[in-house]
Design a protein with these regions (language model features):
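Short, solvent-exposed loop/turn and secondary-structure capping segments
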Residues: 2-4, 62-65, 77-83, 133-137, ...
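Alpha-helical metal-binding/catalytic segments enriched in His/Glu/Asp
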Residues: 52, 61, 68-74, 78-133
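His/Asp/Glu-rich mid-to-C-terminal helical/loop segments that flank catalytic regions of hydrolases
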Residues: 110, 114, 224-236
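A non-catalytic alpha/beta surface segment that caps or lines the substrate-entry region
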Residues: 1-55
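Solvent-exposed loop/turn segments at secondary-structure junctions
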Residues: 15, 21-22, 35-38, 57-59, ...
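Metal-dependent peptidase/peptidase-like ectodomains
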Residues: 126-223, 234-235
Length: 236
């Protein structure tokens, strides 16, 4: 859609402004989305992921990669998947689902661009998540690096509505190092982390875990505005 194209172009401009490396022309990884057919007739839609890379600072580790990702699509004016289907014509902005996660990835890219990590980082914004993880499914089959060089994937989906300093983190059992990594990372902020072991779930980290890549999915829980036109920026 024009909105999807505009969002992708914005993300690409931000990554370019940080001086990140493009892994495909203009940071855009094009693919053809084939959402599940509900009427018995399959459709094909051109779409895109937005992908950028930041080389690591440690020569011994820069050939290992961490993917930091989030989906940037939402429902828009479609009532398919909406929990307020009677609100026809309403624009479902998806401020929490998932502009919040997209913003988190962009902000992490900005921070790391000034202070690179030891390992290389791939920043990836996926389209087609709401239609069945289509963008991330394509990405894991067409990564700019070898699959076995990706040591972890961090997914941010719906991270803008935290209550009582509580964050749910899925996938903590997918790597033995994750519990201690989270503990160290949380030392300063002292958030209440509700860890869940399983790496599978209804978001893009599942595409990576299916490839045996350790994953973490950060999530601040569901709310009454989920998949409704009331998921607006003023509530973030």
């Amino acid at each position: 859609t024009p909105g999807n194209d505009s969002a992708a172009a914005y993300l690409a401009r931000r990554y370019a402004s940080f001086g990140l490396k493009a892994t495909s022309p203009g940071f855009i990884q094009k693919f053809v989305a084939r959402p599940p057919a509900h009427s018995g007739q399959s459709i094909s839609l051109p779409s895109q992921n937005v992908v950028a890379m930041l080389p690591g600072r440690d020569p011994a580790l820069r050939n290992e990669y961490v993917v930091i990702g989030a989906h940037f699509d939402h429902l828009g004016t479609s009532t398919e998947g909406a929990l307020d289907p009677d609100a026809r014509g309403a624009v479902r902005l998806g401020a929490d689902d998932n502009a919040s996660g997209s913003a988190a990835v962009v902000e992490l890219a900005r921070i790391f661009s000034h202070s690179p990590a030891r390992r290389s980082i791939i920043f990836a914004n996926f389209s087609g998540e709401e239609e069945g993880l289509l963008g991330s499914a394509y990405f894991v089959d067409h990564m700019p690096v070898a699959t076995d060089s990706v040591v972890a994937m961090l997914n941010f989906d719906m991270v803008g509505r935290m209550k009582n300093d509580r964050v749910i983190v899925y996938g903590v059992a997918t790597a033995t190092e994750f519990p201690s990594v989270l503990e160290r990372a949380n030392a300063a902020t002292q958030l209440k982390i509700a860890g869940q072991g399983d790496g599978f779930g209804p978001s893009d980290q599942s595409s990576f875990y299916a490839k045996n890549i350790p994953v973490l999915h950060f999530f601040t829980d569901l709310h009454d505005d989920y998949h409704r036109a009331s998921d607006t920026p003023d509530k973030i």
